[in-house]
Amino acid sequence: MRVVVYLSTSGVYGDCGGARITESQPLHPRNARAVRRVDAERALTRQARRGLFRLIILRVPGIYSQTRLPLERLRAGTPALAPEHDVHTSHIHAADLAAIALAALRRLRRRVYPRVRIYHASDDSEMKMGDYFDLVADAFGMTRPPRLAREEIAARVSPALLSFMRESRRLDNTRLKRELPIRWQARDVAQGVAAAAARGA
């Protein structure tokens, strides 16, 4: 039996108003990128249920690593949302995402799964976006970004960043930790950023 691990996006949920959500949360994609991922998830799920393969879908939040931090954005002085307008985000270190994908493949090959299983490939962080930028700035001795109200920020950031600023959710990773245990490199983004700063990005 063939096995497939598909890396989707947590963007398939759209805006959840900062709520903590599980894998059973209804999908409400709000941009073309997320719509494409929903279409791909559904197409793969149909094929898996027809018996073509066993499938794990990993819904992935913001990926970061030693070489994937918002340092250029901080140097450019790109603003973040004011605290009262800020959005909740989730994160995963690239090395931990790779470990999760490998754990998923191993479990699929043991045939202990239903034909389709979904996981939030997220660490334990519960952090707002602006606080994440502040965290990185502090770790690397940089100036924190200015904070602007939601109505002011649209003209100052890219459309891609603005789309992230319009969605707020917290991913519950209970199922992941119970069924796909890994040796974490960074259980939360604060630990991962501190390690990156210690090594020098």
Segments from the language model and where they lie:
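Mid/C-terminal beta-alpha module of Rossmann-like enzyme folds, strongest
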Residues: 98-100, 104-161
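Substrate-positioning beta->alpha
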Residues: 63-73, 82-106
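Catalytic helix-loop patch of NAD(P)-dependent Rossmann-fold dehydrogenases
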Residues: 17-57, 82
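NAD(P)-cofactor binding segment of oxidoreductase domains
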Residues: 1-7
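Amphipathic terminal alpha-helices
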Residues: 187-201
